[in-house]
């Protein structure tokens, strides 16, 4: 076992996703069963007391890998020496709120967090933004951390990726483990494009295995893209445990690598691949090795896929222009 604990900062730690996430991190599921962790919980002042209650529960669980828990309401202190940051806390969209108001409110959260990461985080910092609008929140944070390599800022589309695997496995009546090379393209929003044309199921193309283009276009894609809204309607609250599980998956894969013969999906800064403007934080098919994500190259895209990707990328570009106009980047 490594003797030096990894510092993991979780924002919005008193929320439902935070609660579902923290115990799994402390148990070793984020980084592995031989890596001790120190948890640093960041909350707004009015939620610090609740976060302190979660810290007491974490202590009571006596996790062998948990080297300590600290609670903060100051971003500079919370990110001091941090190796892994999960930015979960964000301002949710409320009824009647315009998109500009939402972006502005989240800019007030992610700008200072980016600055705090820039000034105090460890040199090997890795950042995953979970709080929505995740791609653009990640862009805001990354812009305000100019001394941190841009590739260290990512946004989560692993939940969409996992949802796509689950829906395809259910349709075909196979275990989810048999589904390989699913891709989520673009924004973590209703415009995202879940792509099964390069997926593999028992050696066959996912689309060929389904054999029903109408199901792909009219049921699969909207079901995955709008699954969050479906869960809110059924559960009466937003996805929490599944979002936490996807965040664990994202970081674990980033640190430990993708399995041979497979890839995953992550929103990372574009290098211009597949016509996505450079610098946009967009979801791509990626592999991970040596602690780095790499975009899978050379995939052929038909007109259907190209149209779907372009629509989501346009939305990302519009969000970037909106936060630029607000002076947030």
UniProtKB/Swiss-Prot annotation:
EC number(s) stated in the UniProt entry for this protein: 1.1.1.37
Binding residues for NAD(+): 12-18, 106, 113, 130-132
Reaction equations catalysed: (S)-malate + NAD(+) = oxaloacetate + NADH + H(+)
Coiled coil keyword on record: no
Entry's Gene Ontology BP terms: malate metabolic process; tricarboxylic acid cycle
EC primary class: oxidoreductase
Disulfide bonds: none
Family: Belongs to the LDH/MDH superfamily. MDH type 2 family.
PANTHER family on file: MALATE DEHYDROGENASE
Role description: Catalyzes the reversible oxidation of malate to oxaloacetate.
Protein name: Malate dehydrogenase
Species of origin: Frankia casuarinae (strain DSM 45818 / CECT 9043 / HFP020203 / CcI3)
Lineage, uppermost ranks: Bacteria, Bacillati, Actinomycetota, Actinomycetes, Frankiales
């Amino acid at each position: 076992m490594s003797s030096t604990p990894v510092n993991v900062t979780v924002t919005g730690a008193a929320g439902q996703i935070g609660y579902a996430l923290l115990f799994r991190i402390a148990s070793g599921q984020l980084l592995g069963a031989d890596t001790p962790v120190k948890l640093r919980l960041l909350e707004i002042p009015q939620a610090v007391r609740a976060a302190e209650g979660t810290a007491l529960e974490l202590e009571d669980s006596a996790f062998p890998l948990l080297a300590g828990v600290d609670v903060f309401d100051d971003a500079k202190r919370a990110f001091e020496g941090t190796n892994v940051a999960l930015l979960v806390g964000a301002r949710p969209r409320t009824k009647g709120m315009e998109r500009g108001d939402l972006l502005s409110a989240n800019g007030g959260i992610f700008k200072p967090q980016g600055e705090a990461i820039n000034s105090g985080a460890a040199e090997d910092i890795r950042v995953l933004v979970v709080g929505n609008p995740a791609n653009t929140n990640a862009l805001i944070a990354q812009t305000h951390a100019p001394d941190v390599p841009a590739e260290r800022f990512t946004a989560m589309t692993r939940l969409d990726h996992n949802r796509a695997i689950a829906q395809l496995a259910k349709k075909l009546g196979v275990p989810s483990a048999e589904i390989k090379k699913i891709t989520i393209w673009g924004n973590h929003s209703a415009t995202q494009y879940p792509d099964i044309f390069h997926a593999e199921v028992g050696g066959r193309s996912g689309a060929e295995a389904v054999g029903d283009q109408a199901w792909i276009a009219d049921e699969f894609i909207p079901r995955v893209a709008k699954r969050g809204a479906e869960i809110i309607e059924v559960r009466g609250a937003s996805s929490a445990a599944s979002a936490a599980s996807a965040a664990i998956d994202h970081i674990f894969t980033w640190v430990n690598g993708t399995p041979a013969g497979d890839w995953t999906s992550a929103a990372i800064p574009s290098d211009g691949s597949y016509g996505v403007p450079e610098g946009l934080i967009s979801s791509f098919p990626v592999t991970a090795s040596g602690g780095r994500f790499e975009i899978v190259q050379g995939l052929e895209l038909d007109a259907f896929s190209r149209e779907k990707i372009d629509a989501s990328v346009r939305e990302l570009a519009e969000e970037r222009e909106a936060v630029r106009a607000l002076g947030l980047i």
